[in-house]
């Protein structure tokens, strides 16, 4: 394990030297991928969220990366989201009410209290973090230099989830009521970054949750439905006109590769399905039918070669497994990650 950690540390340091302060971006062009960060959400209560680091060349994974770099401190209780921005990873830990700002070269983290906000999803723009929060329903703007909250935009009664930015606007999913988790909204808030006020709302489908930027003018929203008579769906929003395209299939999680969404729909009690969605709303078949020994919980596509990464949920009882498949469906490797691996970020030069 020490040798693995040394190799991974060298990879991370090399990548940081080549890094520059840039926006969280839609992939494209030639990139060199050396590894991946895996956010392990952890179960509610046991304080077992973590971050794993994968060395792709050796197919070795270090599940103690964050813990070892921070004097045996665990990440916290239910890590929700992770982004890389410049030389740092930023992680929201909902039940711990914290934001972690992690130096990617060393793994050392500055922990920031978020009071009782219950931070959820993160987007980045202009040296700021934009974080959706449950309590109260709002989005906050955090300066990445001072790690302080600069401003707050309140969003109404429903709890917000995913957030993405395009055309000078933040798009935030309005999901469900705190007082009644079975009362769902069907709106996406549009917040102007300059005014930091709600400029509009866009009607989508019941229970919008994940939100990603598909391209410079397209926002994709996965709508989970009500687990009953309203089916899951995916809605594409034109970031300029705020017009919508309803795709007709659900997206529990999404990853962007070459201008397309690689998505899966994993309804409770149902069989997972996989698809590729284009910006015009057309749907094509996934290149293969993944077999990952359980329900999917994360998806990512290596921007350098199109390899598809999927993680399962370990049935919420044991650590999940991370699978890597070539585009033709051939399995390259399988490695055990942490509890509930939920997000994959590739480490690029």
Regions found by a protein language model. Give the residues of each.
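Bacterial N-terminal signal peptides that target proteins for export
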Residues: 1-8
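C-terminal motif of bacterial Sec signal peptides marking the signal peptidase cleavage site
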Residues: 16-19
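Predominantly soluble domains enriched in secretory-pathway, periplasmic, or organellar proteins
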Residues: 21-349
